[in-house]
Amino acid sequence: MSFIEKVRKLRGAAATMPRRLAIAAVGASLLSGVAVAAGGSPVAGAFSKPGLPVEYLEVPSPSMGRNIKVQFQGGGPHAVYLLDGLRAQDDYNGWDINTPAFEEFYQSGLSVIMPVGGQSSFYSNWYQPSSGNGQNYTYKWETFLTQEMPLWMQSNKQVSPAGNAAVGLSMSGGSALILAAYYPQQFPYAASLSGFLNPSEGWWPTLIGLAMNDSGGYNANSMWGPSTDPAWKRNDPMVQIPRLVANNTRIWVYCGNGTPSDLGGDNVPAKFLEGLTLRTNEQFQNNYAAAGGRNGVFNFPANGTHSWPYWNQQLMAMKPDMQQVLLSGNTTAAPAQPAQPAQPAQPAQPAT
């Protein structure tokens, strides 16, 4: 059955569902199609020229009880953390598979860090191993990215644990902003590209849960509990705008409108999902301005679909801005203590 036929079949079934659930179901189906359309062959340095000083590191994560693969290109004491999408692979980071990011940042004065893995994780600290797919450990990506890996990188690769940038796309767009909200010294710069910036709102928890289940059988209840759990708002960039404003974080927010340009992405899922995501990005800009935010770049062009060429274009567009912020020496954000993830009164129960 073709993708379009699947969508038509789902739309027919959705006609009997409540409206919010129907939208979520169709959206989740389209989201899974985007992942396929935006995929690529897992080849090292896929679109970067050969001979670059890219290293493949094994960084210990005591919180997850395993080593995490990290692709790394040294370039200076400050680094760009490039976070992957929903279907992150266990062999290479999507930025390496689908873009020439290593080549683009070679001799830029910035190191490049690409953590590998984390499918459907939202780079968050989960409550428990995912129920239903046999996961035998608990995702603790926030701990890894903000404590374990920075200390290891400082000791072994001379990368500072402060004054870095977090750049995320799709699933990880909001994650980048959340990392900056709670860890302002580490991330004075954060960028979201086509990110889901209000995950606790309305039908978004349902949509996210369906998409996670489709991508590896992951259970959103195991991540942040039911949609009423405070962890959803704790990890919601829209809710955490006051932190970003108080920190004076330099933010870069991009979302297309679902119309393809000469960069490509002219397929139903890529167009639909970008259009679906745009509303919350525009609302984020409005709320940010209303909260007194004055340190953001917002790009909502008259084109752009949910696909890698547009995200790479934005990465290159923000590069000079990122260099100016991170290499100027003025990377000290407002002092703030990292807030701990909300804890439930008792372990969240698996969804039924």
Curated annotation (Swiss-Prot):
It comes from the Bacteria. Its main location: secreted. One of its GO terms (cellular component) is extracellular region. It comes from Mycobacterium avium. The antigen 85 proteins (FbpA, FbpB, FbpC) are responsible for the high affinity of mycobacteria to fibronectin, a large adhesive glycoprotein, which facilitates the attachment of M.tuberculosis to murine alveolar macrophages (AMs). They also help to maintain the integrity of the cell wall by catalyzing the transfer of mycolic acids to cell wall arabinogalactan and through the synthesis of alpha,alpha-trehalose dimycolate (TDM, cord factor). The active site is at residues 170, 274, 306. Keywords: Acyltransferase, Secreted, Signal, Transferase. InterPro entries: AB_hydrolase_fold, Esterase-like, Mycobacterial_A85_antigen. It is found in: Secreted. It is an enzyme of class 2 (transferase). Residues 332-352 are annotated as: Disordered. GO terms for molecular function: diacylglycerol O-acyltransferase activity; trehalose O-mycolyltransferase activity. This is Diacylglycerol acyltransferase/mycolyltransferase Ag85C. Belongs to the mycobacterial A85 antigen family. Substrate binds at residues 86-87, 170, 198, 276-279, 306-308. The lineage of its organism: Bacteria, Bacillati, Actinomycetota, Actinomycetes, Mycobacteriales. Residues 1-37 form the signal peptide. Residues 102-112 are annotated as: Fibronectin-binding. It catalyses: an acyl-CoA + a 1,2-diacyl-sn-glycerol = a triacyl-sn-glycerol + CoA; 2 alpha,alpha'-trehalose 6-mycolate = alpha,alpha'-trehalose 6,6'-bismycolate + alpha,alpha-trehalose. Homodimer. The keyword Signal applies.
